């Protein structure tokens, strides 16, 4: 079976931020998203990949009007020149995410994370 969404160990290309988004949509909505995970630091400048910026639309996410709601995906840019991190908004303005080198966790969505947000998106069948 799958690991729980909280307190997963971080393993790049396996248990990482996109892996958590994949699991959230599979467990919560029965939606299978495309698996873009790779086991190298693709967000570093020497790599051409830019998965979040280039793939969100083809993966089924859409921009929306109105306020964000639980289940929306947040794409962030954290200590990189590319959009390199994602999480899921939860009830109570919480963010479910899995940061490099940390256990997956829920944190308040504001301040640091909100300032680094590039897009908030909703899966097309949930719009």
Regions found by a protein language model. Name each.
Residues 1-8:
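Active-site-adjacent structural segments surrounding the nucleophilic cysteine of cysteine proteases
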Residues 5, 102-104, 115:
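Residue-level signal for pocket-adjacent positions within structured domains
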Residues 9-29:
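Active-site nucleophilic cysteine motif
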Residues 14, 32-37:
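Surface-exposed patches in mature extracellular/periplasmic domains of secreted proteins
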Residues 29-33, 103:
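Secondary-structure boundary/capping signal
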Residues 38-103, 126:
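...with weaker cross-activation on analogous glycine-rich loops/strands in unrelated enzymes
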Residues 107-127:
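Glycine- and charge-enriched low-complexity intrinsically disordered segments
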């Amino acid at each position: 079976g799958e690991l729980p969404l909280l307190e997963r160990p971080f393993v790049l290309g396996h248990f990482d931020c996109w892996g958590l988004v994949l699991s959230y949509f599979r467990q919560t909505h029965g939606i299978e998203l495309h698996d873009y995970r790779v086991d190298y630091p693709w967000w570093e400048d020497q790599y051409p990949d830019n998965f979040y910026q280039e793939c969100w639309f083809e993966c089924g996410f859409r921009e929306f009007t109105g306020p964000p709601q639980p289940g929306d995906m947040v794409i962030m840019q954290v200590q990189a020149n590319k959009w390199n991190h994602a999480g899921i908004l939860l009830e109570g303005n919480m963010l479910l995410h899995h940061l490099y080198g940390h256990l997956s966790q829920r944190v308040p969505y504001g301040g640091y994370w909100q300032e680094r947000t590039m897009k908030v998106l909703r899966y097309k069948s949930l719009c």
